[in-house]
């Protein structure tokens, strides 16, 4: 029966491998896939999205990854063993707490300490979850008709070399979840018909070829969760019919060219979650029938270029979660029948479309980043289907993001243009400060232009983004947008720091001569723009070191929090955000705290303390909102960068929310905080409105200097705070004792 099963499986393998080539499908453009037997083609984004876009449901068929032999094996095995049993018991002798049905006996959780005596015609014996610790000599010798034995969860520590003597008809043996430390040579020598041997979750540290002596018909060997550090020199020497081997979650450190040399029948090989560091080039050369290979979660850093050259029938390959440093361009060139390829958590710096082109039957691929999916336009299902920003359909995958990018861009541009216009029309006493504010608004306007551009390209690629994703991220417009966003961000940060320090000197040291003149201020502002330009332009100077610095995501912003990013890109991004920007943020926070403390101290020293309470509250409120807006903008970025340093996995959606919602906060709020809400602006606006409403009846006469009220634009208290200060009280002298 098991030989028949083996023949069926091999037939299924070859038929399944050729199935796709026999199907006639319409020719579709790159990135599009057929709707079954219809002439209609749809892009990848419309396949397996839960919606019948084809009209015949073909776009929602075969969405699950059923390649490999798990499904085929389960189906065939299920059909062979599907037998309906009656409730009648054919056993005359068995323990009281056991359940009998025909010739099968289940003694689960029966508190047994040894194999019980039962009728010799038993065919299935289940002794799971008992207290059996030893299997002595000939313990099953009376039960020559046994076909299945289940001994899981017993903590068996000792198995006699002759424990299974005489079980010539045994087909399935479960010894998983026990305390077996070794397999003695010849322990299975009488089990010539055994097809399944399951030894999962045992502390077995070593096995040899002689451990499996006699297993001529073994089809399935599972040793998951053991403590193996090495495999026998030739694993299949005593198991010529071995078809499926599962050695997951062990401590295997190496495999050699001879390990699977005699495993001609092997179709499934699982070796995930081990400690394999290198796989020799000829390791799998004899596995001509291999259909599924899993090498995931090992320590493999390098793969020989011809490692898979003999695996012509391989349909499923899993290499995910390995610290691979390089993937050869022709690594998968011979895998013509491959249908599923898993490369999750693997950085491929030399990725190209040619690397995957030979795999014509590939239907499922799993890659590290959504960006990589643009290199496999011929694959129907590519995961991840989004990077949190973009999807296969749209540059901005989230509907909220699509709307918000326009709203925030509009607020940012209109607010800053309004401030520039108003500041140009209204004459202020402090012209240098007004100039600084207008320059700040220019920098913030660039962020609005960046967001508008992202919105425009989102509309341009709507519904077909994946088709153009690679071209877009490598394009000049994308790089220019990234440059523009970085320039805006850095110039804005440096300008805010400059303005903060300028006011810090005015408030904390009111009697010093540390003041910048108009020319000095102009030089400082020009220098800030030059520095910001250089910071944003440096990645263009060495593309071999920085890579495509601005083209790592659809919005072209260089947050770079992924561990596997190019070292140059990631290091430079860290230098910008955790170097320049974090330092600037700390300077701003400390300066405002010091300024508030200085104002508070000065107020307490005046004679009219109560008159200053309301003013202090106003100052405190405005200082709070200035610092709070900076915190909203930068703290999320700092947290993300610090978490990336700690190697914490960060969801891809983070970038989109930071770029659309958090980073533009300062650009959108700066006009409000520094101009539109100030008393200076309000009063000047009222004056302009009055001029348009009525003609002046009389001219205001000049008053004496001591009683005059002077309008000041940020001249004494804070950045963005304007107030009327009587000149006589503006210099707050200490109260004499």
From Swiss-Prot:
Main location per the UniProt record: membrane
Pfam assignment, any one: 7tm_1
Disulphide linkage map: 28-41, 35-54, 48-63, 478-556
Xref: Gene3D superfamilies: Low-density Lipoprotein Receptor, Rhodopsin 7-helix transmembrane proteins, Ribonuclease Inhibitor
Cytoplasmic topological intervals: 421-438, 502-520, 597-622, 675-737
Keywords tagged on the record: Cell membrane, Disulfide bond, G-protein coupled receptor, Glycoprotein, Leucine-rich repeat, Membrane, Receptor, Repeat, Transducer, Transmembrane, Transmembrane helix
Residue stretches of each LRR repeat: 121-142, 145-166, 169-190, 193-214, 217-238, 241-262, 265-286, 289-310, 313-334, 337-358
Transmembrane domains' residue ranges: 400-420, 439-459, 479-501, 521-541, 576-596, 623-643, 654-674
Gene Ontology biological process: adenylate cyclase-activating G protein-coupled receptor signaling pathway; adenylate cyclase-inhibiting G protein-coupled receptor signaling pathway; male gonad development; negative regulation of apoptotic process; negative regulation of cell population proliferation; oocyte maturation
Keyword Metal-binding on entry: no
MF term (GO), any: G protein-coupled receptor activity
Cellular component terms (Gene Ontology): plasma membrane
Protein function: Receptor for relaxin. The activity of this receptor is mediated by G proteins leading to stimulation of adenylate cyclase and an increase of cAMP. May also be a receptor for Leydig insulin-like peptide (INSL3).
Protein family: Belongs to the G-protein coupled receptor 1 family.
Associated disease: Defects in Rxfp2 seems to be a cause of impaired testicular descent (known as cryptorchidism).
Protein name: Relaxin receptor 2
The species this protein was found in: Mus musculus
């Amino acid at each position: 029966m098991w030989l028949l099963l083996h023949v069926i499986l091999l037939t299924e393998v070859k038929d399944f491998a050729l199935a796709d080539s026999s199907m006639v499908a319409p020719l579709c453009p790159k990135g599009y896939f057929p709707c079954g037997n219809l002439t209609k083609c749809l892009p990848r984004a419309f396949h397996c999205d839960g919606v019948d876009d084809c009209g015949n449901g073909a776009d929602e068929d075969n969405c699950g990854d059923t390649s490999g032999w798990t499904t085929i094996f389960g189906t065939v095995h299920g059909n062979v063993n599907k037998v309906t049993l009656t409730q009648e018991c054919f056993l005359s002798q068995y323990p009281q707490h056991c359940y009998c049905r025909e010739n099968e006996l289940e003694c689960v959780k029966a508190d047994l300490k040894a194999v019980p005596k039962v009728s010799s015609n038993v065919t299935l014996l289940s002794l799971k979850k008992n207290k059996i610790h030893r299997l002595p000599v000939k313990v099953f010798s009376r039960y020559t008709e046994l076909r299945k034995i289940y001994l899981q969860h017993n903590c068996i520590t000792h198995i006699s070399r002759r424990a299974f003597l005489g079980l010539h008809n045994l087909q399935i043996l479960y010894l998983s979840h026990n305390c077996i430390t070794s397999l003695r040579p010849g322990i299975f020598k009488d089990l010539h018909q055994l097809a399944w041997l399951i030894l999962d979750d045992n502390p077995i540290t070593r096995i040899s070829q002689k451990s499996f002596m006699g297993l001529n018909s073994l089809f399935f060997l599972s040793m998951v969760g053991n403590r193996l550090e090495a495999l026998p020199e030739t694993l299949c020497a005593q198991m010529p019919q071995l078809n499926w081997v599962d050695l997951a979650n062990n401590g295997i450190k190496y495999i050699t060219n001879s390990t699977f040399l005699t495993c001609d029948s092997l179709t499934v090989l699982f070796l995930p979650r081990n400690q394999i560091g290198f796989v020799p080039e000829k390791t799998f050369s004899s596995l001509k029938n291999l259909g599924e290979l899993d090498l995931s979660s090992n320590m493999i850093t390098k793969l020989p270029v011809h490692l898979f050259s003999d695996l012509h029938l391989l349909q499923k390959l899993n290499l995910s979660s390995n610290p691979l440093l390089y993937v050869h361009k022709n690594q998968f060139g011979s895998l013509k029948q491959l249908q599923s390829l898993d490369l999750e958590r693997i950085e491929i710096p030399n990725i190209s479309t040619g690397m995957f082109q030979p795999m014509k039957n590939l239907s499922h691929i799993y890659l590290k980043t959504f960006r990589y999916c643009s290199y496999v336009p011929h694959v129907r299902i590519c995961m991840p289907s989004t990077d949190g920003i973009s999807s296969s359909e749209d540059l901005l995958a989230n509907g909220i993001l699509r709307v918000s990018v326009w709203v925030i861009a509009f607020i940012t541009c209109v607010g800053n243009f309004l401030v520039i216009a108003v500041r140009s029309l209204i004459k202020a006493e402090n012209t240098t400060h007004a100039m600084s504010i207008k320059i700040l608004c220019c920098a913030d306007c660039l962020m609005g232009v960046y967001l508008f551009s992202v919105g425009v390209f989102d509309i341009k690629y709507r519904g077909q983004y994946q088709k153009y994703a690679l071209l877009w991220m490598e394009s000049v417009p994308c790089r220019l947008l990234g440059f523009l966003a970085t320039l805006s961000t850095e110039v804005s940060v440096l300008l805010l720091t400059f303005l903060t320090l300028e006011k810090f000197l005015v408030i904390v040291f009111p009697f010093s001569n540390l003041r910048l003149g108009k020319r000095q201020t102009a030089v400082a502002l020009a220098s800030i723009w030059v520095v910001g330009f250089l910071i944003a332009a440096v990645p263009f100077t060495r593309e071999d070191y920085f890579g495509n610095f601005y083209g790592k995501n659809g919005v072209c912003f260089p947050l770079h929090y992924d561990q596997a990013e190019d070292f140059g890109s990631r290091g430079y991004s860290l230098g910008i955000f955790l170097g320049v920007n974090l330092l600037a943020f700390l300077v701003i926070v400390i300066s405002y705290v010091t300024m508030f403390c200085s104002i508070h101290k000065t107020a307490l020293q005046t004679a009219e303390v109560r008159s200053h309470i309301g003013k202090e509250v106003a100052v405190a409120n405005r200082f709070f909102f200035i610092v709070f807006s900076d915190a909203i903008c930068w703290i999320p970025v700092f947290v993300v960068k610090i978490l990336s340093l700690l190697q914490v996995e960060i969801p891809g959606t983070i970038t989109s929310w930071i770029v659309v919602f958090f980073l533009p906060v300062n650009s959108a709020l700066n006009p409000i905080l520094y101009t539109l809400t100030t008393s200076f602006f309000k009063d000047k606006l009222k004056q302009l409105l009055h001029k348009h409403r009525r003609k002046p009846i009389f001219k205001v006469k000049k008053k004496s200097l001591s009683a005059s009220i002077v309008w000041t634009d940020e001249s004494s208290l804070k950045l963005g705070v304007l107030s009327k200060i009587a000149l006589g009280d503006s210099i707050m002298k200490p109260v004499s004792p």
